[in-house]
From Swiss-Prot:
GIY-YIG domain location: 8-83
Domain of life the protein comes from: Bacteria
Coiled-coil positions: none
UniProt protein name: UPF0213 protein ECA0725
Source organism of the structure: Pectobacterium atrosepticum (strain SCRI 1043 / ATCC BAA-672)
Record-stated family: Belongs to the UPF0213 family.
Pfam families linked: GIY-YIG (PF01541)
InterPro entries: GIY-YIG_endonuc, GIY-YIG_endonuc_sf, UPF0213_domain, UPF0213_GIY-YIG_endonuc
């Protein structure tokens, strides 16, 4: 991993499959990653799942912080993830970044 990639701006994103499943990931470019997933060149978990919809994304800081946030989101229940999608809390990522900077 290059120094630039490690410290660039990373985003957390959530996609919904046609079956209603939610997928959480991180990337430096949400549009590019969406296109990769749609083309079947993204995560194996999404291959063959049909049309994907971006339902949430937010800035997550550097790669390390993005990975930590992704892990925390993946530990949530389906109903908790649905609440995130419904509420669209941009503060989720901001609060996580602030806690990291002050801690």
């Amino acid at each position: 991993m290059t120094e630039h990639a490690e410290h660039s701006r990373w985003y957390l994103y959530m996609l919904r499959t046609v079956a209603g499943a939610l997928y959480t990931g991180i990337t430096t470019d949400v549009s590019r990653r969406m296109n990769q997933h749609q083309a079947g060149k993204g995560a194996k978990a999404l291959r063959g799942k049909g049309e994907l919809t971006l339902v949430f994304h937010c800035l997550a800081g550097d790669r390390s912080n993005a990975l930590k946030l992704e892990y925390r989101i993946k530990q949530l229940s389906k109903s908790q993830k649905e609440r995130l999608v419904q509420d669209q809390p941009q503060a989720l990522c901001i609060d996580t970044l602030s806690a990291r900077e002050s801690g």
